[in-house]
Amino acid sequence: MRKVLLLAVVLLGVFAFFAFDLGRFLSLAYLKESQAGFAELYAQKPLQVVGTYFLIYVAATALSLPGATIITLAGGALFGLWWGTLIVSFASSIGATLAFLVSRYALRSSVEAKFGNRLTEINKGVEKEGAFYLFTLRLIPVVPFFVINLLMGLTKMKTVVFYAVSQIGMLAGTLVYVNAGTQLAQIDSLQGILSPALLGSFVLLGLFPLIARKIVSAVQKRKVYARWASVRPQTFDRNLIVIGAGAGGLVSAYIAATVKAKVTLVEAHKMGGDCLNYGCVPSKALIKSAKLAHQMRHASNYGLSDTTPTFSFKAVMQRIQDVIRAIEPHDSVERYTGLGVEVLQGYAKLINPWTVQIALNDGGTQTLTTRSVVIAAGAQPFVPPLPGLEEVGYVTSDTLWETFGQFDEIPQRLVVLGGGPIGCELAQSFARLGARVTQVEMASRIMIREDEEVSELAKASLEADGVRVLTSHKALRCERVDGAKTLVIEHAGAELRIAFDQLICAVGRSARLTGYGLEDLGIPTNRTVDTNEYLQTLYPNIYAAGDVAGPYQFTHVAAHQAWYAAVNALFGEWKMFKADYSVIPWATFIDPEVARVGLNEQEAKEKGIAVEVT
């Protein structure tokens, strides 16, 4: 009830302002015409004039009405520079705080709907820098005064903090505008405020928060590095050390070598990472073989005769290895060495922010110092903690290529655990090659990150190829019944059993966060390595890119992030670049393929972005 009453008062005030055309009194022309009369009245009744002016200013700012600039100029014209600044400073801060409270208690839903995108950014700033963030917003004139008041009311900032910071932060800008008001007789238009002297004042106002940020950043850096100050090298062996030779690591090293930086790339296992050895390349090779088999069975769709494909499963799996070997030279040690990258095969560990120790695969150890590090350690399949899973055995999207490559025949009964892109691609492909595939997904639909109709289309496509798709089914445990492997699942309170020959775990991938020193350095992680918008970790000279950094687990995004990580690591002293995810291509290679660029409908709705569906 109180919120309704408060909102009614606010709306009544706004209605009265426009209904009675009160805005005509808030024009430069009216102010100049009335200046002499106001001055005479002020000389006769100073307290009444100051009080009335103060209340008008507070009301206008509290209701977020247009005209604050004119009222501020009037303060300078009537009261002079110092008294005008004092009066306007308190009136504007009190009015802003009232608008802040109105937004917090009465306008939350409407303001969020109108300024949702700005609110997201401001919330991030408030969470990270709190009062200092508001202070910088108050200092920069290009940020609308009323927008800050309304949006800050939706944050968790305390009212007393908002008032105090606004009072201090707006003081310099108030002084500039009040000073302009004292020269009102010489100003013919609002553009006249931007005289060279005043323009210089605004330039200083704009530069001040940047300088302040630099100072704060330097203080924060010093604090972060304090425990390591005694071991910071005077000189460095490398400009950049890259940990991991997947897409993110290879691109980072390539960029560093291109600009003639001293760069070392460390890889413990296979060059090319997940994409070449376990992900993109082998899965697409499998999909191609499966799709061709499907087209042969349905050749009549192309005006040909339907044909049952005959093939050796071992030959299909061997072809996948052949495709990998054909691409390997592009990601090889030899190629990158030729580009100027030092490639070390072994396990890297961060000893301190500038020192990396490498346990070489040949048994040796090498320790290098570096100005910057890019962590591109990738991700690994997540295996759910199902009772009995280890006993019955399973494969993942990493291990199935080698395991299935040993089979002469395709496993007849396959269970694919997981309804994401990887699970769907594998389920359809093996079904097209002759396996009886059951796909189990705990969520209400497969490919849950796509729009609902897309998920339904994907399900229909998989079922048309013979995949038994079970959504809203939860895997409980694995058992052996009379020697047969069985997965026990639950649906609608009832338990079901599915016999299988092979089980593929495809429930997602988790970032590699242990084994290379993150925990020893205290670098925060939360499913991925915590990074800022420049891909910096807790230590500004240590960056992360690819699956280990998130938020996407795509090869092309890893390469995309690698550019930002490498360039910022090498040239961040002069210029930093924020990672841009505004246009991310996204494809799942079931048949028909599911692809998009940027947000889909459900993501847009979650972000409060209006969409048009055609």
Give residue spans per PLM region.
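Hydrophobic alpha-helical membrane segments of integral membrane proteins
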Residues: 5-8, 47-90, 123-184, 216-219
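Membrane-interfacial helix-loop-helix
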Residues: 13-53, 89, 93-149, 154-155, ...
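Mid-to-C-terminal Rossmann-like scaffold of FAD/NAD(P)H-dependent oxidoreductases
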Residues: 230-240, 245-250, 258, 451-453, ...
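N-terminal Rossmann-like FAD-binding beta1-loop-alpha1 element of flavoenzymes
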Residues: 238-265, 423-432
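Glycine-rich flavin
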Residues: 255-261, 266-410, 443-447, 453-454, ...
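Glycine-rich dinucleotide-binding loop and its adjacent helix/turn
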Residues: 280, 377-436, 440, 465, ...
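A Rossmann-like FAD-binding core segment of flavoenzymes
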Residues: 306-307, 342-345, 349-363, 368, ...
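FAD-site-proximal beta/loop scaffold in flavoenzymes
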Residues: 390-408, 497-575
